[in-house]
Amino acid sequence: FVFGRGGEEAEGLAAAGIACETIPGISAAQGAAAATGIPLTHRETAGMLVYATGHLQGAQEDRTVQLDWEALARPWQTVVIYMGVGTLPVVCEQLVAHGLPESTPAALVERATLPEQRCIVGTVATLPALGVRYGVKPPALIMIGEAVGRQVVPPGGAGMVSSNF
């Protein structure tokens, strides 16, 4: 139920009198972190974790996303943006405009935990161009923060791409 339509679907089923079952699991962000070796928190760089959406209903018309950019640009946290591939340039631009250093480590994790997973690592300044260069498509997560720079590549390191930030 993290930014997916799970809650909406459950409401619709309940309204129609259809029983449904929710099976607990892990979030896409947790799976991506484990699969790529990117820590979501790290006691030296990130004591907070923030999940946000990069896609809001109606946002496609003008490519804007209404988020608390000042809060998302704070230090000492990792920010994971769900559904943000289409608004990646705006997300990165707004974070920098609100005080996040351009050199902040950032990653795009495409198709996390699947065999065709790719992890593209750069900085908040370089990530939009890297996304275009490597043709990143949804589903993908954006992970931003100093903890991203603490990535420990898992055995095999399949799908890892780095821009040597």
Which residue ranges define each predicted feature?
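Hydrophobic beta-strand scaffold residues
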Residues: 20-22, 40
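A short, small-residue-rich loop immediately preceding and capping a beta-strand
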Residues: 1
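A contiguous loop/helix-start segment that scaffolds small-molecule binding in enzyme catalytic cores
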Residues: 4-12, 18, 46-48, 53-165
